[in-house]
Amino acid sequence: MTLPRSSRSVAVDGAQPYTITIAPGLLADDARLARHVRGRHALLLSDSQVAPHYAAGVRAALLSARPDLQIGELVIAAGEASKTLDTFGSAITALAELGATRDACVFALGGGVVGDLAGFAAACWMRGVDCVQLPTSLLAMVDSSVGGKTAVDIPQGKNLVGAFHPPRAVLADTDTLRTLPARELRAGLAEVIKYGAIRDPLFFQWLHAERHALLDSDPAALAQAIARSCEHKAEIVARDPLEKGERALLNLGHTFGHAIETEQGYGAPGNDNLNHGEAVAVGMVLAARLSATLGMSDAQDTEALRALLHDFELPTDIPPGLPPEALLARMRLDKKNIAGRLRLVLWRGIGKAEVVPDVEEAAVLKILAG
């Protein structure tokens, strides 16, 4: 695979098409930022880790191009624990206090939590205003900022309250990865590995070959990984924007992973609970093991996946203290389930994921029990 130029763009087709731009320096590109604000109001939503680095610069860039803008700001506590209905309410209040009209724009400056919250607030305010995703984590660049899924968590489960709301644009400034903690970089790489696992064996091999460059945050390697991941997601989302079929493949490992996240209380900066990417890494191995148990795949493929995740210093086992029965109960609330039956994304080997309905709970419980 050849390395890309410093700037890449990926078109997402559909009823509301948009472009993902991947390049350094985008947060300082005043004209590019401002062109997406149709009216006079903009809300900049960020978190306590990202805002000190970038919020003032984004505000200054917007005002440089559009001095007439009225810009509100909302900074939330960093971490999944902030992705709640209460915080969503704070975003709605911020839009109301700004006097935002239907031509307003919400800028999501941060990782997946910020993107989900900002997108959901934009979807709901006046039945829908524009949202521009400014992802600052690798995970957000390759997954959560793309595709228009927005949601918050409730105690019963992750992402159970939300809406589909495609962004007006995604501007992935790769310079922001310089300030990304190593653990968060690895979490994003779990989602990158997912794309190879579900539909691209050559990408899977490339990730193994480039593992040292990626872990060292080599700009060219990261740009290639981001672009290839976004290309895969864009192709699938264009064909299945509302997740009626093929788009569910993007959830390999997520049913198991979301159950782990919910049962342990969600990861947050500074705690030992698995973050989203880490939980997905474990979930992918569990899905691969279940596939092998059901006779769908070879155990060698499971081991290849486990080995690649280990190469990227990601976990592959369920954390201790999480009862299998409790995890299964969480899985029963997964959004992909139909008529009370488990519907999981499994695989027939590397690059061959598929959705499997009516998976027997006994088989899942056996995998959860180790």
Curated annotation (Swiss-Prot):
EC number(s) from the headed UniProt entry: 4.2.3.4
Q: Which GO terms describe its biological process?
A: amino acid biosynthetic process; aromatic amino acid family biosynthetic process; chorismate biosynthetic process
Any idea which positions bind Zn(2+)?
191, 254, 276
Q: Which UniProt keywords apply?
A: Amino-acid biosynthesis, Aromatic amino acid biosynthesis, Cobalt, Cytoplasm, Lyase, Metal-binding, NAD, Nucleotide-binding, Zinc
UniProt-listed InterPro entries? Dehydroquinate_synthase, DHQ_synth_AroB, DHQ_synth_fam, DHQS/DOIS_N, DHQS_C
Q: What class of enzyme is it?
A: lyase
Taxonomic superkingdom: Bacteria
Q: How is the cofactor bound?
A: Binds 1 divalent metal cation per subunit. Can use either Co(2+) or Zn(2+).
- Reactions performed catalytically: 7-phospho-2-dehydro-3-deoxy-D-arabino-heptonate = 3-dehydroquinate + phosphate
* GO MF annotations, alphabetized: 3-dehydroquinate synthase activity; metal ion binding; nucleotide binding
* Cofactor requirement: Co(2+); Zn(2+); NAD(+)
Q: A Pfam family this protein belongs to? A: DHQS_C
The pathway to which it is assigned is: Metabolic intermediate biosynthesis; chorismate biosynthesis; chorismate from D-erythrose 4-phosphate and phosphoenolpyruvate: step 2/7
Can you tell me which residues bind NAD(+)?
A: 112-116, 136-137, 149, 158, 176-179
Which cellular components does GO assign to this protein? cytoplasm
Q: Which CDD domains match?
A: DHQS
Question: Carries keyword Secreted?
Answer: no
Gene3D superfamilies in the record: 3.40.50.1970, Dehydroquinate synthase-like - alpha domain
Localization annotation: Cytoplasm
Q: Which HAMAP family match?
A: DHQ_synthase (MF_00110)
UniProt function note: Catalyzes the conversion of 3-deoxy-D-arabino-heptulosonate 7-phosphate (DAHP) to dehydroquinate (DHQ).
Q: Which family does it belong to?
A: Belongs to the sugar phosphate cyclases superfamily. Dehydroquinate synthase family.
Official protein name in the record: 3-dehydroquinate synthase
Organism for this UniProt entry: Xanthomonas oryzae pv. oryzae (strain KACC10331 / KXO85)
The gene name reads: aroB
